[in-house]
Amino acid sequence: MLRPPLAKTILFPSSKELLTNTMDAILFEAAQRGEVNFLQQLLRENPLILDNVALLSTENLLNVALITGNVSFVKEITRLKPHFVKELNQDGFSHMHIAAAHGHVEIVKELIEVDPNLCRLEGREKRTPLHYAAIKGRVEVINVLLCSCPECIVAVTVERETALHLAVKNHQFQATEVLVKWIRENNKDEVFSITDEQRNTVLHLAIWKRQRQVVELLLDSRLVGSKCHEPLRPHCTGCAANVPQ
């Protein structure tokens, strides 16, 4: 039995699809390289190009610029399309979560300028940008977020973890030190008494994980709260999963 010619069995993309895919690739490459002038040139030729990419592409242009840390490109995109900053990627992370996790402090500042409420935005597992900064040990980002949104210090995840819990769980001593210092200076002693889902305070976690420096830091501050003297319950679960990479 004769088979039809191969050419007839292949579905070729239309010229419109090819053009869209090409423009997507060009824009994403510009985002990776931070080529703002090239972006402006494309916009002069097609003022709707950013909207077209947002509608037709599964990837987010701003995410690409965020991950590579191109501040000028991020500034230009947020200036042109401020509503982009509230969009989530396919994994459920906001742009602020990604910037905080990667330690891009200038981008974090820029996003705060666009919308200060992004500091308290909850993502997967109710984690805020401060939670991700603590997990990754991004000290500069922690300082910026606390300065812009002090109430974030008491925000808890679905497992009732504060940023301090997460810093200790992930062995981020510098982040822990910065958080403890901020808590002390801002009279937020109650944070030391907050227990997670397993009823562990940060002191419980530090003792269980044998983090001597953290234990000494907490005891030296004398701000560990009465709940820290309850029996230790070493039932810490993993917490580094589901973090923007």
Description of each model-found segment:
Residues 6, 12, 16-21, 36-92:
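Internal amphipathic alpha-helical repeat/solenoid segments
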Residues 23, 57-58, 92, 126, ...:
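Start-of-repeat signature of ankyrin repeats
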Residues 38, 72-73, 106-107, 140-141, ...:
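Conserved ankyrin/ankyrin-like repeat signature
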Residues 43-48, 76-83, 109-118, 143-152, ...:
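Ankyrin repeat domain, specifically the short helix-to-loop turn at the C-terminus of the second helix
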Residues 53-55, 88, 121-122, 155-156, ...:
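Ankyrin-repeat boundary/linker signal
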Residues 151, 158-164, 169-245:
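Membrane-proximal ectodomain caps of single-pass cell-surface receptors
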